[in-house]
Amino acid sequence: MHDCLPTLQLLKISGISDDGLCPMCNYEEESTSHLFLLCPFARACWHGSSLAVHTTDFSDIFVQQWLINLINALNWNEEGSFDYMQSIFTTLWTIWLHKDTVVHEGKQLNPIEVILTSQTLPCRYKEVFSNQYSPLITRSKPSNEPNNVTR
């Protein structure tokens, strides 16, 4: 896993931005680890989720290493492991998306919105995916077709 998300810290290092401070807390530079794990906003999101992620246990960990450790520690034969990781990645994505709406649309910080969105997205995905493979509605036969011909 490479550190290639355009965080403000990376944009500052690249000379694209002058300011690397996290727009969520204005306290530390926005690295991926800060944005997803260490920022008080991210901590509130994880704390409010049902995923048992205790970000107070993290201090100098890179988010990439945390994910690798998490993936390696899971028993993939155990029921619910895939759903758990799906929820982890959905929460990460929702934090990123919320940060973007705060920065680009002036939206107010709302950890509850992140928590609820990250909980409902997997359900919405499953619903859409299951609807794609549900039986199609049978169409009626054209009037010029004999009754014994089926489609």
PLM segments and residue spans:
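Primary recognition of RNase H-like, Mg2+-dependent phosphodiesterase/nuclease domains
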Residues: 1-151
